């Protein structure tokens, strides 16, 4: 007899249906439906998780309304002690509501509220090994993880975890193909059925009917390696691939969350599910952690990192612009760093230093170097050449993060894997590269610009999993977009420390750009997607305090963007608009607007615009 349990909000169980098969080999299937708190089954607007145990095999599918965004997909793991992918029997379950509030120092939102329903399904394999699968369902997604509640060592050699996205779904996938685990590739946009059977890095974005699905990973630490997906050539299902022959941990093991953001495009673009699932902050005192803008000389003048005088010039410019930091990249000299730090401090600018990951490999190296940097007065480190998702590297992260917190050093990882909720657990992480960014637009003979679609895909893919150090607003780079579109990246791309990478002279030649760049924040109290089509259009509204900003970027022909301003609170507002003039140069215009207005801005081919909104008392003409 088929048995079915309906867990509304994962808290209410119908009284007669939770009869469990006596054995995982029973011929009947037991099914459960999990919903977000306060949601009834088939309500439609939010995702539902459908779990089935059929002939000893566990599967998960996900629906949103009438749309199946994830077809029945295998769950389970294989350990050194046995195969936990088949022959499974349920030994019990438990449920609890999740209600949390937390703060982050960076991101699309700084204050967070989590409401989710959690169900733990306890299972036993044919060999007697026990484990659990923990599911969470919220209004914006579904996630699960495996738990081994044992004080002994656990060795996971394989996960059966798969994601059977409908083959007709549109997909935006990042090939994991360059051998460096640095996520510096360009997304491939095709239906699932036409994607190559290779490995892909997170996050993976899919358009399924009227719904969007993003697959990603959260809460990774040294007990596990960072996974990726591989598309099977025959089945066209995505299997989860581990980076090591085995992931080994002592004591209770909780694997990272296998997470799916599900909803309309605005739900996906605004979601903070990746930090909602991450472990709480390990730091009691975060007063020393301060996001901001950084001047950076390496992009425009590589050898300048070795010149004290050049670095002072960038400090002077940062001070003039009101930017908080200057980053000194590879080539700095220890003999003059204390002088530079004092020079910068006198101008209210902090100094970040570049560091090769190799000098942080051991406890003694970390203690020696981090203490030296802190004694100099350095505020943060850009650690480069991380280049691995393997478990030995995630253990390294644990050590580096703890040591940097001890010495009050903020961090930015380059040549590194994507963040997976790290900014909640370790708030001193201001950003991570993990993107084919502006370093690849640095002028040199024969260099071709990135496809314009790359720029307009990133807000819906890479930036969803955490702060992204693209190092934007490089007017003198090899690029496909207009100047208005390039300037708008300062608003469209989110990074806790935002490095505007062009030369001082390039910015000084564009006073319109300087006006925006001297004011634009790097962290946001609120973010809303106003319009979007990955690879074609992205229009975001972001709030910092009482001020709102809009950033819009497009791919394609010149057009006019009409943006309703319903996100503004009641009252009269001034809009300072930064876009492309008829001659291709940046222009600024000002309009008085209200929440009932629509902003109509002509946009050049592959263009964009940015706008700053402030409340306008009578007679005000600027913000």
Task: For each feature predicted by the language model, list its residue ranges.
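Glycan-recognition and catalytic regions of carbohydrate-active enzymes
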Residues: 502-549, 583-584, 588
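N-terminal accessory beta-strand-rich subdomains and adjacent acidic, glycine-rich linkers
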Residues: 30-276, 585
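Secretory targeting and sorting signals
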Residues: 1-26
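C-terminal beta-strand-rich structural cap/linker in extracellular carbohydrate-active enzymes
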Residues: 591-623
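Conserved, mostly hydrophobic/aromatic
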Residues: 146, 318, 384, 411, ...
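An acidic-aromatic substrate-binding cleft motif
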Residues: 250-325
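Aromatic- and carboxylate-enriched substrate-binding clefts and catalytic-loop regions
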Residues: 330-482
